[in-house]
């Protein structure tokens, strides 16, 4: 099975942006989301990681724009940001997105997420953003600012509820181009049978290939944002490199 690369398009106020360590106010704009999404599609992406940051930060929504773009694309879309109840979930699923990621609500509403996982199965992934605090990995919600509990306890609960996939981000790495936290990702993969999507810190092709080595441990995908926008390497180069691994 080929390692999957998901180029990211994060949206703030109708623009494609990247943040530094997920912090509001650190946005750097990269044009329109449609331009970015079409560029990644043209370069051979099979998936797009599409994030409504305004919704994630509880300060608005780019839903209509993102729904329209999702409908225009020929590739699979993983949609995330601000999906916290049945209404926002149904709206996200109605865009035709292949997968919907849920973050904060998976931490704060355990009974609801259990029901969502039961009803929608593989269409749902859970975003687990974490930060190391006083030697403990703590989960983060609401735009990565609120505490959602101990990582391993949260993971055990969601795993027992049947979550089909986890997207794991070390917040301190996101948007920094300093390399992924491979040890953390491997530890999480070892604690669940669900596949892991790695997120945060990718800077070089070596970073991508370094993660792809651990497919047999359960890390089967990676989200890449700033490295592509800052031209550290092209999406085509990354896709070719992982294809050679087989």
UniProtKB/Swiss-Prot annotation:
GO biological process: L-histidine biosynthetic process; L-tryptophan biosynthetic process
EC number assigned by the record: 5.3.1.16
Keywords: Amino-acid biosynthesis, Cytoplasm, Histidine biosynthesis, Isomerase
Pfam families to which the protein is assigned, alphabetical: His_biosynth (PF00977)
GO MF terms, alphabetically ordered: 1-(5-phosphoribosyl)-5-[(5-phosphoribosylamino)methylideneamino]imidazole-4-carboxamide isomerase activity; phosphoribosylanthranilate isomerase activity
UniProt similarity note: Belongs to the HisA/HisF family.
Annotated protein name in UniProt: 1-(5-phosphoribosyl)-5-[(5-phosphoribosylamino)methylideneamino] imidazole-4-carboxamide isomerase
Gene that produces this protein: hisA
């Amino acid at each position: 099975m080929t390692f999957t690369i998901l180029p990211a398009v994060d949206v703030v106020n109708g623009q494609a942006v990247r943040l530094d360590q997920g912090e509001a106010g650190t946005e750097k704009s990269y044009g329109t989301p449609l331009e970015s999404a079409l560029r990644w599609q043209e370069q051979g992406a099979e998936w797009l990681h599409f994030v409504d940051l305004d919704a994630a930060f509880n300060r608005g929504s780019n839903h209509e724009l993102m729904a329209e773009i999702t409908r225009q694309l020929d590739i699979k879309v993983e949609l995330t940001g601000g999906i916290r109840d049945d209404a926002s979930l149904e709206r996200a699923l109605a865009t035709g997105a292949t997968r919907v990621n849920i973050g904060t609500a998976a931490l704060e509403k355990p009974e609801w997420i259990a029901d969502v996982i039961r009803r929608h199965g593989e269409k749902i992934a859970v975003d687990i953003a974490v930060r190391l605090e006083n030697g403990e990995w703590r989960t983060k919600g609401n735009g990565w600012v609120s505490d959602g509990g101990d990582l391993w306890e949260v993971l055990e609960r969601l795993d027992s509820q049947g979550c089909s996939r986890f997207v794991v981000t070390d917040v301190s790495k996101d948007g920094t181009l300093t390399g992924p936290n491979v040890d953390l990702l491997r530890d999480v993969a070892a604690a669940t049978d669900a596949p892991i999507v790695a997120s945060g810190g990718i800077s070089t092709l070596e970073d991508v290939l370094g993660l792809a080595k651990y497919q047999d441990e359960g890390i089967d995908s990676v989200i890449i944002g700033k490295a592509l926008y800052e031209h550290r390497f092209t999406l085509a180069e990354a896709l070719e490199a992982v294809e050679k691994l087989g």
